[in-house]
Amino acid sequence: MHPRTFSKHLRHAGIVAAIQAAEQKTTGQIRVCISPRHTDTPVAAAQAEFLRLGLDKSPARNGVLIFVAPRAHKFAIIGDEAVHAKCGDAFWRELADVMSGYFRKSEFTPGIIHGVQKAGELLAEHFPSPRLGGMKS
């Protein structure tokens, strides 16, 4: 699917609201990238975008990127070192499976929002916002 066509089907305000709600509860950062390029290696492309966005610069190493490449019909979810240490591969695989189910039904916005919400829950549990009285783990 062409990225512009894909982007037109997204409810951007809903995705932004989900990111804002998730980030209110954590010191972590969540980003969503819709790539205009075709990629056969979504994980490598996501890792490059993760670095380009500076998500690796957080002192707590608690950033998450949901990277979607509509031209290739692929996506990847990248969590920084500290996030991955808290959840391991199983969390990412399960999240990717659920998001894939949404995407197969062309429910792109709900799929991305689900990913944002689950990443936010993980971040809030392990990297809570001090504004909410939480302490970093």
List where the protein language model places each region.
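A structural boundary signal for the start of the first folded domain, especially the loop/turn
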Residues: 1-137
